[in-house]
C-alpha cells in the first residue's frame, strides 16, 4: 500500500512540476525580471544614497529579503492557481475518489509549490550575483528557512484555493494581505530603525520572522531570535496543514 501511495505522490509531483516548467515564460521569467528591477532601483540607485545597514551595503542587506519575497509569492501562487484550476475543471474529483490519502494529495501539491518557489529563489540569487558578491553565513539556516517558508506559503495557497469560488478570489489574498505583509516584513529596512511601538507591532507579522532568519543565514544578522523564527514557522505550518487536511477530508468546496 505504501508503494501505491508513493507512486501517487510522485505522479502529482511530476504533474505539478511539469505544469509550471511547461509555461516557464509565465512562471519563472516574470519574477526574475521584477526582482532585477528591485535590485537596480532600490539597490543601485537608492541604496547608494542610503549607505550601510548593520555594517553591510544596502544592496547586500536587501538581497535576502528580495529572494524570500520571490519565494513566498511564487510558492503561494503556484499551489493556489494549480489547485483551483483542478477544482474548477473538476479534475480534483478524480483524486478524491481514488484510493489516495488526503495527506498524499496535500504533499503532492505543496511539493510542486515548493519546487517552483525554490527554482525562482535560485534564479533570483543568480541574478543578485551581478550586483553584490555572494556571501553565506550559514547554509543550514539558508536552506531551512527557505524550505520551511516555501512549505508554509504553499499550504496557504492551497487553503486559498479550497475556499475560492472564482479565479478572482485567488488574487485577493496576495493583493490585500500577502503584498502588504511582505513589504512591511523588513525586506527594505531593519526593525531597529522603527520606534518601539512599531517594532512591537511588526512582531505580529509572521513574514518578519522568515526574512530575519533568512537574512541571518546570509549575513549573520537578525532582528528577532532564531528560535522564535523557527517556532513561528513550525506552528504556522502545522496549523495550516491541519486546516487543509480537515477541509479536503470533508470535501469542503470540492465536491459538487
Where are these regions (language model features)?
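Short cytosolic juxtamembrane segments of multi-pass membrane proteins
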Residues: 248-256
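Membrane-interfacial helix-loop-helix junctions in multi-pass membrane proteins
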Residues: 20, 182-239
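Alpha-helical transmembrane segments and their short interhelical loops
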Residues: 102-174, 221-245
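Short alpha-helical transmembrane interface motifs in multi-pass membrane proteins
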Residues: 26, 61-65, 72-77, 107-109, ...
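Pore- or pathway-lining transmembrane helices of multi-pass membrane proteins that form conduits
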Residues: 29-33, 166-185
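Hydrophobic alpha-helical transmembrane segments of multi-pass membrane transport proteins
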Residues: 33-38, 58-128, 157, 175-176, ...
Amino acid at each position: 500500500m505504501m508503494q501505491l501511495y508513493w507512486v501517487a505522490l510522485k505522479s502529482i509531483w511530476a504533474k505539478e512540476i511539469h505544469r509550471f516548467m511547461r509555461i516557464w515564460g509565465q512562471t519563472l521569467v516574470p519574477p526574475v525580471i521584477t526582482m532585477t528591477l528591485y535590485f537596480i532601483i532600490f539597490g543601485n540607485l537608492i541604496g547608494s544614497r542610503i549607505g550601510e545597514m548593520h555594517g553591510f551595503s544596502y544592496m547586500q542587506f536587501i538581497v535576502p529579503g528580495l529572494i524570500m519575497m520571490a519565494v513566498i509569492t511564487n510558492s503561494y501562487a503556484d499551489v493556489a492557481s494549480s489547485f483551483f484550476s483542478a477544482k474548477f475543471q473538476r479534475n480534483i474529483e478524480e483524486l478524491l475518489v481514488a484510493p489516495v490519502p488526503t495527506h498524499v494529495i496535500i504533499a503532492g501539491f505543496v511539493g510542486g509549490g515548493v519546487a517552483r518557489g525554490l527554482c525562482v529563489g535560485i534564479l533570483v540569487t543568480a541574478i543578485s550575483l551581478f550586483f553584490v558578491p555572494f556571501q553565506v553565513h550559514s547554509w543550514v539556516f539558508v536552506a531551512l528557512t527557505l524550505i520551511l517558508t516555501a512549505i508554509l506559503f504553499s499550504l496557504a495557497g492551497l487553503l486559498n484555493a479550497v475556499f475560492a469560488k472564482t479565479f478572482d478570489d485567488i488574487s485577493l489574498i496576495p493583493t490585500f494581505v500577502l503584498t502588504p505583509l511582505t513589504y512591511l516584513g523588513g525586506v527594505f529596512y531593519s526593525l531597529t530603525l522603527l520606534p518601539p511601538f512599531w517594532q512591537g507591532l511588526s512582531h505580529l507579522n509572521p513574514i518578519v520572522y522568515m526574512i530575519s532568519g533568512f537574512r541571518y543565514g546570509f549575513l549573520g544578522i537578525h532582528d528577532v531570535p532564531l528560535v522564535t523564527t523557527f517556532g513561528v514557522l513550525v506552528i504556522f505550518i502545522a496549523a495550516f496543514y491541519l486546516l487543509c487536511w480537515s477541509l479536503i477530508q470533508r470535501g469542503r468546496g470540492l465536491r459538487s
